[in-house]
């Protein structure tokens, strides 16, 4: 049944590819990857394997800079704000002549900035991101959960208290999850995605802490769904014209940290047909275009899959798709340059791991008694894809090893007690911007 809760994204899907490719030949077009961590590295490899030139724009040391598939690296001081991102893209366009290339954001705040400035950016780049009306439904979890409720998509019990007095309306004794409506307003201050409270007294204390960090009205309280990684699932897709042209369903068996993971560390493709219909219903309602991941958790109390999060960009383990038969970044590129894209769906039973976070997380879980060593070792058998290591492109994995001390401070790979001092930072000093183009300069597109 057609949903009536549609949000107009401002995109005419019948003309999107033609509009995006006007005035350019596909062979002259490359990809601009915004963020060069393992997620961005996967995008670069996806495009580079097909001979597509790649430029990485980043504000920190990252593994993609060492990839043989990256022709150009643009280092800037900051990418977190809308102004800094637009400035970085302008520098990339003017100094490297990469106009009309396809943009690949890897961070939520960059997706929001591209959506807010989409029309202005279309004259210089291909922007495979819908307008802000659609993106806000994914970026702001208040909008995500309200829309899901209108569409009868299961979600955890959720409350939106504006003040501490509103906690009286929370008719549950816990345990609770306290999270921000907009992740970036909380994550960069705390290094975590959410906090847990087991009692109502803890809930009040944690709410006060969260309310002191995020803007008024941005604190969300949810019931904590029981169960570990075996209950974490996701539906991933390239969505176009109201349909999933490509899709992949996964179980996110392990994540870092184990309680409220910032990123998955061990993922396998599975066949769970129940996730497709609610996901497609949600994406149709917001008029979505592009790559997308919808995170769910199966509630063992009632067997329902409940929507937790929507990520309107490539996700950390997107390279699992290529091993399972779906090369998501390349499919998006083909669509952006007007090439045909055939419907494809990932095969089940394919596994992905990121050793840099999975191993230390497993050690902590083994010490805590929540994971048995034998079970962990058996899970490593038959892994098909590692997030960074590749025989065809080995340098990034060497670079990652060298970066581990930096990542331990920057990305929170250290135990929590060692990360408590937020003043402890490891920074690599930069000029305002640095451009490295020692391999092959970006091709200049001719109109």
PLM segments and residue spans:
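Glycine-rich phosphate/pyrophosphate-binding beta-alpha loops
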Residues: 253-257, 262-264, 311-326
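Peripheral (often C-terminal) accessory segments that flank ATP-dependent C-N-forming ligase machineries
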Residues: 13, 19-20, 334-447
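Glycine-rich adenosine-cofactor-binding loop
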Residues: 32-45
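Phosphate-binding site of ATP-dependent enzymes
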Residues: 198-258, 269-280, 297-298, 304-306
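Short, glycine/polar-rich helix-capping loops at beta-to-alpha or helix-loop-helix junctions
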Residues: 56-70
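Conserved metal-phosphate-binding beta-hairpin within the catalytic cores
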Residues: 283-319
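Active-site nucleotide/adenylate-binding loops and adjacent lid/helix of ATP-dependent enzymes
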Residues: 135-220, 241-243, 273, 277
């Amino acid at each position: 049944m057609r949903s009536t809760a549609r949000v107009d994204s401002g995109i005419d899907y019948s003309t999107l590819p033609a509009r995006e490719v006007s005035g350019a030949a596909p062979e002259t077009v490359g990809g601009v990857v915004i963020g060069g961590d393992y997620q961005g590295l996967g995008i670069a490899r996806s495009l580079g394997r097909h001979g597509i030139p790649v430029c990485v724009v980043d504000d920190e040391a990252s593994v993609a800079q060492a990839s043989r598939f990256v022709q150009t690296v643009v280092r800037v001081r900051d990418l977190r704000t809308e102004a800094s991102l637009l400035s970085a893209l302008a520098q990339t366009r003017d100094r490297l002549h990469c106009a009309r290339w396809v943009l690949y954001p890897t961070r939520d705040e960059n997706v929001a900035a591209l959506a807010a400035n989409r029309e202005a950016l279309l004259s210089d780049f291909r922007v495979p991101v819908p307008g802000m009306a659609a993106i806000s439904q994914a970026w702001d979890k208040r909008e995500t959960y309200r829309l899901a409720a209108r569409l009868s998509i299961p979600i955890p019990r959720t409350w939106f208290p504006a003040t501490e007095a509103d906690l009286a309306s929370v008719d549950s004794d816990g345990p609770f999850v306290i999270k921000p409506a907009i992740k970036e307003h909380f994550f960069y201050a705390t290094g975590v995605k959410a906090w847990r409270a087991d009692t109502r007294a803890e809930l009040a204390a944690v709410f006060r802490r969260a309310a002191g960090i995020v803007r008024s009205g941005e604190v969300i309280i949810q019931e904590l769904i029981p169960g570990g990684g075996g209950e974490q699932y996701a539906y991933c897709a390239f969505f176009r014209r109201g349909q999933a042209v490509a899709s992949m369903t996964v179980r996110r068996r392990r994540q870092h940290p184990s309680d409220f993971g910032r990123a998955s560390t061990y993922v396998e493709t599975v066949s769970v047909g129940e996730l497709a219909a609610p996901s497609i219903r949600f994406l149709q309602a917001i008029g979505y275009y592009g790559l997308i991941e919808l995170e769910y958790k199966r509630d063992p109390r009632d067997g329902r899959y409940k929507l937790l999060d929507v990520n309107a960009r490539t996700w950390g383990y997107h390279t699992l798709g290529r091993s399972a038969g779906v090369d998501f970044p390349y499919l998006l590129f083909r669509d952006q340059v007007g090439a045909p894209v055939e419907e494809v769906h990932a095969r089940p039973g394919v596994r992905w791991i990121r050793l840099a976070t999975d191993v230390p997380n497993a050690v902590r879980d083994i010490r805590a008694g929540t994971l048995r060593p034998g079970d962990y070792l058996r899970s490593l058998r038959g892994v098909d894809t590692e997030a960074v290591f590749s025989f065809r492109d080995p340098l990034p994995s060497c670079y990652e090893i060298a970066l581990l001390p930096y990542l331990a401070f920057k990305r929170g790979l250290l135990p929590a007690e060692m990360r408590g001092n937020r003043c402890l930072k490891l920074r690599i000093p930069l000029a305002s911007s640095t451009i490295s183009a020692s391999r092959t300069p970006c091709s200049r597109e001719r109109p």
